[in-house]
Amino acid sequence: MDKILSDSAMATDDIRILISYALWSQWGQIAVEQEGTARAVRAELVAQHRHGQEPAPAMLTELLASMVAISAAAHALDALYGQLVTPAIKKDGPKDDKGREAHIRECLKRRFDTGKRDREWVSRFQRLFDLRDAAVHAEVKSLPAVPHPSGVSNAGQVNADYSAEEAVKAVDLMLDVLNTCVQNPKPSDAEAKAWAVGYGRAVETLTTELRVSRDARPLVIYRG
């Protein structure tokens, strides 16, 4: 036994174990969880307002959860690009002065049959990455108050931009992209087909978690 163990130890001296992570799955999980938090806090916000309580603390919590959900959804799509992009796609893709979202969509279009979905994604990708970039590269601006999407009061523009509604849209886009890719790998792309098989369960799990969360806590607004 000692000899076997000794030989095994020596045999593994030159073996390297390589581990990789597709971080879009982790970012996707964060996005789904924080979108759920934003919706749950929205319900508290509306209830507090209905019973005459100060809504500002809940509004702030919704803002924070929505910022994380929106950013995480964008990070998930960015990480998906990082997993799927090839040197050829980088070489032939959009020019460097194009936004990150354009590079992501081009990569997906090259590896999956996105069809009409790609055209439908243009404005949604733009909105998501505008919000992500504005949060990461924030500027201080004095802007007029606007109605908060909850309907309880006016608030700062940032509260409207990073609201539960925007978090819902961000996560919807993320899962729309993931499900479209899982279901439509290009027949000629063996690696894309293998990706769809290998990650289909992860996408299904995220999608189911979101559906359960939304059934349990729908997004609400104050209706007076």
Name every feature range the model reports, one short phrase each.
Residues 2-98, 123-126, 183:
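Amphipathic alpha-helical interface elements
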Residues 3-6, 19, 25, 35-51, ...:
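Polyanionic, low-complexity intrinsically disordered segments
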Residues 14-20, 74, 105, 118, ...:
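Short linear sequence motifs
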Residues 75-156, 160-180:
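Flexible secondary-structure boundary motifs
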